[in-house]
UniProtKB/Swiss-Prot annotation:
Protein name per Swiss-Prot or TrEMBL: Large ribosomal subunit protein uL4
Gene Ontology BP, a term: translation
UniProt key word ATP-binding: no
Biased composition, class Basic residues, residue ranges: 60-71
Pfam families membership: Ribosomal_L4 (PF00573)
GO molecular function, one term: rRNA binding
């Protein structure tokens, strides 16, 4: 069973917590993680690209010259694709690039990246992150107390609005709730700072 040190906000260690081995202690499946990242990045694409085909281009309703007798190649419209200013053939149209994996595969990818963070000692657990009001300066001090000076993903439990507001303006700090954390979020960060409650909620979802 993987054990992770449990810290207070002031940086002092307050024992250890034992994490679920089936979630935080598996052998990472790099292939599934790669596929999950590609899937998530594909869903982020807007897909609003568009061009005009010959039916959408303005004009071209009249035949430019008669069919026979001119010696020139026959033409039906000045908006045909071979003309300058004509429509585009097989151009991109608005579409959605998103697709989904089976739920078991998505969960395996999340378990893999979390297990990798634990194995590399890049998962920092805190008892809680409580603030009387949104204070960026105080959250910055918490990171200093925990010796976190790199790109970090902060995972909070639902309803901890003051902590979320305190952290969101800091550079190299991303904030998510336990029910919205994604594979791309975890992979993009060098360290993961999670509250004890958030870790419990993640275990409940992935168990």
């Amino acid at each position: 069973m993987p054990n992770v040190a449990l810290f207070k906000q002031d940086g002092t260690q307050n024992g250890e917590i034992t994490l679920n081995e089936e979630i935080f202690g598996i052998e990472p499946n790099e292939s599934v993680v790669y596929d999950a990242i590609i899937m998530q990045r594909a869903s982020l694409r807007q897909g609003t690209h568009a061009v005009k085909n010959r039916s959408a281009v303005r004009g071209g309703g009249r035949k430019p010259w008669r069919q026979k007798g001119t010696g020139r190649a026959r033409q039906g419209s000045i908006r045909s694709p071979q003309w300058r200013g004509g429509g585009v053939v097989f151009g991109p149209t608005p579409r959605s690039y998103s697709y989904k994996f089976p739920k078991k595969v998505r969960r395996l990818a999340m378990k893999s990246v979390l297990s990798d963070k634990v194995a590399e000692n890049n998962l920092v657990a805190v008892e809680g992150l409580s603030f009387d009001a949104p204070k960026t300066k105080e959250f910055k001090q918490v990171l200093a107390n925990l010796s976190i000076d790199t790109k970090v993903l902060v995972v909070l439990e639902n309803g901890n609005d003051f902590a979320a507001l305190s952290a969101r303006n800091l550079p190299n700090v991303s904030v998510v709730t336990s029910d919205n954390v994604s594979v791309l979020d975890v992979v993009s960060a060098n360290k993961v700072l999670a509250t004890q409650t958030a870790l419990t909620q993640i275990e409940e979802v992935l168990a």
